[in-house]
Amino acid sequence: MALTPEQISYRQQLVAMGDFNAHTLLPGEEWTRPENADVRHVLSLIPLTDIQLANRLDVDERTIRKWKSGETSMVFTTWCCLCWLAGLGMLLEEPA
């Protein structure tokens, strides 16, 4: 499924703010691992508590805290899920 116009606009606004790495929104091999600030920003866009998000992703709540602090890095598939939950579209799909 292609990105909606709303998702495209949302991504553009996020990147235009200047404190978000657009390369974290690229699919597959082109993807750049998000920095701590990118992770915190995307997590702040998700309308779930840390406990709810941990349950949704089947991870421990401590893992969410470690992502926020930068103590633990994130794999691509988890980042895809977070971006999807934040309304940024699904990164697993190749652009049209």
Regions found by a protein language model. Give the residues of each.
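Alpha-helix N-cap/N′ positions at the starts of helices
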Residues: P34-A37, V59
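Charged, low-complexity surface patches
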Residues: T32, V42-L43, E71
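N-terminal flexible/basic segments that precede or flank functional cores
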Residues: M1-R33
